[in-house]
Amino acid sequence: MTILTGLMMVLTAQSEIVTALRPAIREAAAKNGVDPVLMEAIIRHESANATSSAARRKNNLAGIMGRRGQRRYESKEACVQDLAELLAKYRSKGRVTLVQISRAYCSSHQHWVRGVSAYMANIRAGKVKEVKPETPKG
């Protein structure tokens, strides 16, 4: 196996972490009245498909900041729920477009809007793999 092949295998495995979170994303989105595709796109963009240091060490898939830097979460699902609540809070303040959300969410909002938009398009086009539930054996 080449180094490149090994790297691609690791990146694919990390990307599948986000895909495996789709049920949690959908549930949190429905509970908070936000778009699950937007949530997944933010998570993929902010965490570089779950490969970022914050995603791996702090379960912070969404780049959510606290008072002392990036927040630490007990689980990735807890971060997903926090993101849904944050987006619902933005919506309640009239921030509904990507540009409006980006101005509150990050400092480099033009880059963020392009990245999140690209992920949203790929998710909606089915270019991001869906994880199928395991079939019980026996």
Positions of predicted regions on the chain:
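Catalytic cores of secreted/periplasmic lytic hydrolases that degrade extracellular macromolecules
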Residues: 2-138
